[in-house]
């Protein structure tokens, strides 16, 4: 291509002409030879990873399409979010918690958290199952909560997490952290009947809210869902709960749990207890934790009645 004569042009005009000249050179480049193959695009394998087990139950193509549509509808535009009834039915949330949970779930932040969970659940095996993420709402109403035990995130091994912090269903081996918790209960109440299982549903029915600061986890990857945003939701729920129900004992176990609730200087209606996480890896042995007795001493003093820490019906 012939050289261009740019004499007499302004600097701006020279830039424009120069750009056009470069573009013309691109167009003039010879095409690929007929026998020269086009470079192949790299594509990732279609579908979920090998061995993936869906937490959604129905894995048919039509179910996937409906699932993706429901994710997209969670955040429709800047401010449109799903109504309470749809969210409550989708996650099996008890109606008793509507007043506390509706403002946190039926808003932009809440819809973003749920949408991020749903997005991950397409390609990850997530615990607990979707219908158990809010299982903690199904055992006692907010006004009946006497104690809140806050942990980190659910167990990441198959068959363990079922929506109650630290708890496992009957028949499942008791995890090390829960063993330490039960040892601490025994130290406070030697006569407590703890049976031979790790299911803490009996505590939940007696007003103990067993809540993780992060409500979901990827299989085999503890801490993997910290960026979903559950912590914002949990902090706000505990703040609302503390403002509507008097005389609650907050047991915050571990550094992460201790960021979920901050007692204000003027709020002496509640008791806040802090201790290291019950994991065997913690520096401080959890078996010496006296929170269970301290909780009952406080509840008895304010007339709310002690908690039976046994695991019998």
From Swiss-Prot:
Its EC number is 3.2.2.27. Gene3D superfamilies: Uracil-DNA glycosylase-like domain. HAMAP family: UDG (MF_00148). NCBIfam families: PRK05254.1-2, PRK05254.1-5, ung. It is an enzyme of class 3 (hydrolase). It comes from Gallid herpesvirus 2 (strain Chicken/Md5/ATCC VR-987) (GaHV-2). This is Uracil-DNA glycosylase. Keywords: DNA damage, DNA repair, Host nucleus, Hydrolase. GO terms for cellular component: host cell nucleus. Excises uracil residues from the DNA which can arise as a result of misincorporation of dUMP residues by DNA polymerase or deamination of cytosines. Therefore may reduce deleterious uracil incorporation into the viral genome, particularly in terminally differentiated cells which lack DNA repair enzymes. Pfam families: UDG (PF03167). Belongs to the uracil-DNA glycosylase (UDG) superfamily. UNG family. It comes from the Viruses. One of its GO terms (molecular function) is uracil DNA N-glycosylase activity. Residues 56-68 have a biased composition (Polar residues). The active site is at residue 153. Its main location: host cell. It catalyses: Hydrolyzes single-stranded DNA or mismatched double-stranded DNA and polynucleotides, releasing free uracil. GO terms for biological process: base-excision repair, AP site formation via deaminated base removal. Residues 35-68 are annotated as: Disordered.
């Amino acid at each position: 291509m012939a050289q261009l004569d740019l004499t007499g042009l302004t600097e701006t005009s020279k830039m424009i002409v120069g750009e056009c000249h470069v573009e013309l050179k691109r167009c003039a480049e010879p095409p690929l030879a007929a026998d020269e193959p086009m470079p192949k695009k790299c594509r990732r394998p279609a579908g979920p990873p090998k061995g993936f087990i869906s937490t959604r139950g129905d894995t048919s193509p039509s179910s996937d399409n409906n699932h993706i549509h429901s994710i997209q509808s969670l955040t429709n535009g800047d401010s449109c979010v799903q109504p309470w009834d749809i969210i409550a039915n989708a996650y099996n949330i008890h109606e008793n918690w509507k007043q506390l949970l509706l403002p946190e779930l039926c808003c932009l932040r809440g819809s973003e958290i749920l949408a991020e969970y749903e997005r991950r659940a397409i390609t990850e095996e997530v615990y607990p199952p979707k219908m158990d993420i809010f299982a903690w709402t199904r055992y006692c109403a907010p006004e009946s909560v006497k104690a809140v035990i806050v942990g980190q995130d659910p167990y990441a091994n198959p068959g363990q997490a079922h929506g109650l912090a630290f708890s496992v269903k009957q028949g499942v081996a008791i995890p090390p952290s829960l063993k330490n918790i039960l040892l601490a209960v025994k130290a406070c109440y030697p006569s407590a009947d703890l049976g031979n299982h790790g299911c803490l549903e009996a505590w939940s029915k007696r007003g103990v809210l067993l809540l993780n600061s992060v409500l979901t986890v990827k299989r085999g990857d503890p801490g993997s869902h910290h960026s979903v945003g559950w912590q914002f939701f949990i902090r706000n729920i505990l703040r609302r709960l503390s403002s509507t129900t008097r005389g609650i004992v907050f047991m915050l176990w571990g550094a992460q749990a201790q960021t979920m609730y901050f007692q204000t200087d003027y709020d002496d209606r509640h008791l806040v207890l802090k201790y290291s996480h019950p994991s065997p890896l913690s520096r401080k042995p959890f078996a010496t934790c006296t929170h269970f007795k301290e909780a009952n001493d406080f509840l008895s003093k304010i007339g709310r009645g002690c908690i039976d820490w046994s695991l019998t019906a």
